[in-house]
Amino acid sequence: MELIKALPEIFEDFAEQRKKSFLTMKELKDRDVPVVGAYCTYFPQEIAMAMGAVTVGLCSTSDETIPVAEKDLPRNLCPMVKASYGFAVSDKCPFFYFSDVVVGETTCDGKKKMYELMGEFKNVYVMELPNSQSETALKLWKEEILKFKSYLEQTFKVEITEENVRKAVHMMNENRIALKNLYEVMKKDPAPMNGQELFNVLYGSQFRFDKEKVPEEINALREKIMKEYEENEKMPKKKRILLTGCPSSGAPMKIGRAHV
């Protein structure tokens, strides 16, 4: 499979941060690093990482490209689906553009239709995600993961070994533990930082491609936060608002910014 390395024609029209993201991805591709994009947190990224690929989330939370998407999709469809499709079809998302394979899943009818249309201009692999928790569902999901592994091996002409899968699992577990420990500093009352600051760290960590460095940096950040919390004046107590859902970035974070 030939990796995508060229920049899109509309590159020069992008804002500075988006240009930076494109160039970061371009550097990876120039080193022959495959990129696998996904739209669901259930995506078994460790399987892709075990073959040396970089993984990245693709769900869009900006309404910028919804008008583009509505040329193909119904106006009353989910905004997240339309935004994601709009960024994909317009080449405005650096992560989608440089993804050699996009992994979808059967979480909703809107996304299934989106993947169908995306398949006309991108390599799309759809995983059957069970919608219940049972022995049968677990068996199905295990089979789906093994099928995905075989697909990557055939597509990229590589062998994904158990040893490399275990290494990837260990690395991602270290990431999750570090992020969980950071999240738990918010148990303090008053909180040592506002929710927007915490979210920026959690969300930004998803777009770090040097995953092996993330735990150490997150742990160092946690220590710094706690040291300053003990030594400096505390923030005033405020009401706490719980934001849930996935994805929770972009437009939903207006609530967080409004209460900083």
What are the residue ranges of the model-derived segments?
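Trp/Phe/Arg-rich N-terminal binding region typifying the photolyase-homology
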Residues: 1-162
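A charged, amphipathic alpha-helical module
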Residues: 1-34, 150-257
